[in-house]
């Protein structure tokens, strides 16, 4: 960085040294300016003009700038590109500054701490995470600065990458010397990595930092007793927030420890395959609520915090059966009470995002309209609470008790802030008339000046007898009294001459000068006083942060409960029940998303039953044609289990389920070129995770395992996977396949059953019935599906000919099924099939009559024919 000689640039350099890794936006009047390398970078990334300072002195300093009132948009663009941006503001009035205006960094915006609406979706969290380690244990803490949520958990080091991927953090804090994630681990993760000094993560420093901030004698009440790694990660987050936000952070929750074993585990592969949050083909979709996803079907929440809570529940279904049952009780009561549900949703629709409004208030970034929105939202809570004060469900009664009406905070805000405040405080009109007497007087002086001048003019005309006397104002002379030359002899002695014109004289008086001074000072005084009053009410509202946070959490849960009740009522969902028998019994189950799409297209979704248990029906092998509904059947079973454990009613006539600890899916295939993995490698890696991680309480969904390689290799692997799950894992499993040979396993393994997707043949055409029933399919109908896809008729006819020839000549692929000597898993005896024509020629040979030279010639011909085939 160049050594600039001016006081301004020395000030800039001094401040820039505080944030060497951030772009510094330096407030100069009505602009934020960037200098040196920051300017070059910003001009390139923002596509704005790069200029230079001090060109004429031969010491040009690159610079660029953006208007202060439009800065947030530019900051957002830089954050989206992964930059950190430090905001340096003028912290004293330029008019009062004796020399150089004092400037300070007021906040540092990073990907993990962004709050602007351009960067943070209303129904998604924006997480900042930190990774800590103590001994053999690792921890991941996360916070959403925009809502105050602050949580931490511990795990094994090898689990960190998966935890970060599932969390979806935008920025992650690491100790500089922590080699937790290898390149292989990190290659699928998308976050900004920020390294902090090692001492920030130490137990003693973090423990003290957390206790001091939250005013606690011990962290044991947060569940952090004897959890050094968790304390280090949580303390590092708080340290970083203090450094970047430069604010009180009163809206943050205490860091709460959560045990990952309390939730069903859904890894990123399962979340993607089941389309819980995003569709597999996002390019074909519009906005988040228009997308064909499970969240899109379930989310009828009316508040931002309710939408975020529903999303979190969907990603982390509960394993606490008592909690699930309480949620279902509440959903059931609201589902049955249509009028109550409608009134609740009406009241909820008037409540804005309390969590994010509160965050802005406590961080000091809330403008007049933000504070008014908070006040008006709090004003709605008493009416909301009155709606459900006689409910029976324990969860609803608990929510009612937790819902602080906050009428005092609402009055505090609404008594002060005007009904239509400006977007920016500097535009004036923020404070309500009648709230502050001095402010009212100043406004009266400023706004009613014309009336006051008219009164002076009338009085002076009467006093002097000059009917043409005028009181006027201009920017050069201010207020003045103008008298024509013919009447100047009538001017009173207290008139002071101010200006002589050709046809008139202009005067002033002590009263007029005093009024002029008051008027000119009034606007500045109004703005200063409004700033003081607004700042005061914002601080007083922030003092109630924990009360508001608690109320926001209650409103969010009520919103989610009402949303699930609404969805259940509209879509004929039924309450699931849970049992300890290990049985999974679903009657007339439906896929929530496909059902919705089918109804939109005036079609009818075909429901299906499912039965699995821990013994005789542990694993179902499902065969049938493409497009027959196998994948839908697999997914809907997994989704019904997930919906049940978030506390939702399910799309089925009835569902009796065990509490599942983890759902695995291996559906579809795609290359992962970024990691150098082929389709088959991705498939095998995902399958390996399932086999190595699943427990008897898990539910596994496998679709076409082995199809990414040669037929016999794929069949062998699929066969072995089924055996392994049946013999060792013992997890309930649905296994869809086109390897019809696998259906023979139902005769060999006691817990395997066959299911098939039925079709109806009509000549050369087929009708997909999409009904799953016991049995096994003997054909895949691939050619019929190809015909439906529009392949040329000549290709279809040729394919049928080849298929008939292949079916006549190919031996059974599975070969002979035998038991190993120790009665272990069934083995497949396979050999290369010999073409039918060659085999017939060999059978027809009369060896007794064949001469040696003829035998050699025949052997050569057969060899050539085999090579050609």
Swiss-Prot record:
It comes from the Bacteria. The keyword DNA damage applies. GO terms for cellular component: cytosol. ATP binds at residues 624-631. GO terms for biological process: mismatch repair. One of its GO terms (molecular function) is damaged DNA binding. Disulfide bonds: none annotated. InterPro entries: DNA_mismatch_repair_MutS, DNA_mismatch_repair_MutS-lik_N, DNA_mismatch_repair_MutS/MSH, DNA_mismatch_repair_MutS_C, DNA_mismatch_repair_MutS_clamp, DNA_mismatch_repair_MutS_core, DNA_mismatch_repair_MutS_N, DNA_mismatch_repair_MutS_sf. Keywords: ATP-binding, DNA damage, DNA repair, DNA-binding, Nucleotide-binding. HAMAP family: MutS. This protein is involved in the repair of mismatches in DNA. It is possible that it carries out the mismatch recognition step. This protein has a weak ATPase activity. Belongs to the DNA mismatch repair MutS family. PANTHER family: DNA MISMATCH REPAIR PROTEIN MSH1, MITOCHONDRIAL, DNA MISMATCH REPAIR PROTEIN MUTS FAMILY MEMBER. This is DNA mismatch repair protein MutS.
